[in-house]
């Protein structure tokens, strides 16, 4: 599932390639993926894509008319949702949720082979209508998420550290992969409970979160390919590397779980 660094890179690429492009037609070949009526889509011709933004695990495309944002396209790609920029004459793939035909004979298409993603087309003042939006905490890389704010917020969220980092009510944008990376960098076990952390542990967790996300975002801005597929995560130190040597101590990394695997080092990340 794309996380904060992946989506930041995709948003930058979408902005570079689509900023200022005019929509001439909009359809939903697989309408179950799109929270919009045919009338909503029919009103889009003439709007301009004003780049792309990211909030939590959502991509946001502001759609402007006469210099004013008229609609927001909010996309949570989940496990397999992908954007494609392709020629308008290209065959429309199965499970294409949204097709925006652009001036210049190109399309922006959203394809989701797992049919799990969600697209919302709504007014710019209606984002709170998206389930869970109003409860979302600050982005994990937000400038105003200072160390002091982090200390205050973490006191309100009990439980194990890995689910805590993945809880969008605490901080938004972190999923299974980067929670492993952050906890390994901080030297904290994923199953350790927040109540066992001292002030130094909390500070170390905060700085690890910021460092890991900053580094990954910088790397993915370089690696993101022209077709806007998220890059395979060679940049990750430990996630899904169970059985390999720990990059820090050389001991074997342990991995548990299946599709939602957790990878950690029992030496570098002691239980307490």
Language-model region placement:
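Gly/Gly-Pro- and Ser/Thr-rich, intrinsically disordered tail segments characteristic of DNA damage-repair
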Residues: 1-119, 242-243, 255
């Amino acid at each position: 599932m794309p996380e904060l660094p992946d989506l930041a890179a995709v948003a930058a690429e979408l902005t570079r390639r689509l900023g200022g492009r005019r929509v001439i037609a909009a359809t939903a070949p697989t309408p179950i993926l799109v929270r919009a009526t045919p009338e909503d889509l029919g009103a889009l011709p003439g709007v301009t894509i004003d780049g792309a933004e990211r909030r939590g695990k959502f991509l946001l495309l502001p759609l402007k008319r006469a210099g004013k944002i008229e609609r927001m396209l909010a996309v949570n790609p989940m496990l397999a949702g992908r954007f494609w920029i392709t020629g308008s004459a290209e065959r429309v793939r199965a499970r294409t949720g949204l097709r925006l035909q652009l001036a210049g004979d190109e399309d922006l298409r959203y394809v989701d082979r797992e049919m799990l993603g969600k697209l919302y087309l709504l007014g710019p003042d209606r984002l709170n209508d998206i389930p869970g939006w109003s409860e979302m905490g600050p982005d994990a890389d937000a400038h105003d998420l200072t160390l002091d704010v982090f200390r205050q917020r973490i006191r309100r969220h009990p439980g194990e550290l890995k689910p805590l980092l993945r809880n969008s009510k605490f901080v938004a944008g972190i999923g299974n992969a980067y929670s492993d990376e952050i906890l390994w960098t901080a030297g904290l076990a994923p199953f350790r409970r927040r109540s066992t952390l001292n002030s130094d542990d909390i500070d170390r967790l905060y700085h690890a979160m910021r460092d890991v996300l900053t580094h990954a975002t910088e790397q993915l801005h370089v690696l993101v390919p022209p077709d806007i597929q998220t890059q395979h995560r060679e940049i990750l130190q430990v996630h899904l590397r169970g059985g390999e040597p720990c990059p820090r101590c050389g001991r074997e990394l342990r991995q548990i779980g299946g599709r939602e695997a957790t990878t950690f080092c029992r030496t570098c990340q002691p239980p307490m």
